[in-house]
Curated annotation (Swiss-Prot):
Outcome of substituting residue 79 to A: Important decrease in ability to enhance AsS activity
Location in the cell: Secreted; Cytoplasm, Cytosol
Name of the protein this chain belongs to: Bradykinin-potentiating and C-type natriuretic peptides
Propeptide: 24-30, 44-50, 64-70, 81-87, 100-106, 118-120, 126, 132-241
Alphabetized GO MF terms: hormone activity; peptidase inhibitor activity; toxin activity
UniProt keyword Chaperone present: no
Residue ranges crossing the lipid bilayer per the database entry: none
């Protein structure tokens, strides 16, 4: 019962709607009141204005002096300076060339940053250092001094005086050798300069001599104990052995550094 009433009312509403709009859409389309589909075509003047650029530059207003000169008649033959400059200006100047960054941006390339990145600012430019000396090389200035020390024997190269040269019968020190006194100060300076490089060589002659004296300490002490100079040398070797002595390696005493023996202890 209820459904039939709802259906009848719906049909009645549809009939009333059809009667109210009967023929009106056709009349509105013919009269131009109905909005037509599609984009509207602008008139010719609007198209010409759009092609000329937007906004279109209008006429510039001349200054007041030029306006007064044009309105005042008769006026003097020679116009004032402002009017002459205005007449000589002509069309507006062309636009200036854009900067390089703007041109690169327009071409699709990112501009190069003028400031270098932080890592390049921290590090200084690479410097060319002098080549380091190899272990088997020695400075050119100390070559002559090194040859002289090697020619004097093991005791002269190590800097420890021999027992026979310094110990006499009366126990006094013997005078220095004449070839030592003949050395110049320059040779001594070059010898002192070249000594650190020789000390770094574990296979050098001086290192082997020092190692032999430390191993045979008792023998050196017995030989040099006869005189005052010899006793001083023995005491020096004894103190050096005490300073450099360690727990030992294969029954041998180690030197101060522990690398000249070559035993790897």
């Amino acid at each position: 019962m209820v459904l039939s009433r709802l259906a009848a009312s719906g049909l009645l509403l549809l009939a009333l709607l059809a009667l109210s709009v009967d023929g009106k859409p056709v009349q509105q389309w013919a009269q131009g009141g109905w909005p037509r589909p599609g984009p509207e075509i602008p008139p010719l003047k609007v198209q010409q204005w759009a092609q000329g650029g937007w906004p279109r530059p209008g006429p510039e207003i001349p200054p007041l002096t030029v306006q007064q000169w044009a309105q005042n008649w008769p006026h003097p033959q020679i116009p004032p300076l402002t009017v002459q400059q205005w007449a000589q200006l002509g069309p507006p100047p062309r636009p200036q060339i854009p900067p390089l960054e703007v041109q690169q941006w327009a071409q699709g390339r990112a501009p190069h940053p003028p400031i270098p990145p932080a890592p390049l600012q921290k590090w200084a430019p690479v410097q060319k250092w002098a080549p380091l000396l190899q272990p088997h090389e020695s400075p050119a200035s100390g070559t002559t001094a090194l040859r002289e020390e090697l020619s004097l024997g093991p005791e002269a190269a190590s800097g420890v005086p021999s027992a026979g040269a310094e110990v006499g019968r009366s126990g006094s020190k013997a005078p220095a050798a004449p070839h030592r006194l003949s050395k110049s100060k320059g040779a001594a300076a070059t010898s002192a300069a070249s000594r650190p490089m020789r000390d770094l060589r574990p296979d050098g002659k001086q290192a082997r001599q020092n190692w032999g004296r430390m191993v045979h300490h008792d023998h050196h002490a017995a030989v040099g104990g006869g005189g005052g100079g010899g006793g001083g040398g023995a005491r020096r070797l004894k103190g050096l052995a005490k300073k450099g002595a360690a727990k030992g390696c294969f029954g041998l005493k180690l030197d101060r550094i522990g690398t000249m023996s070559g035993l790897g202890c």
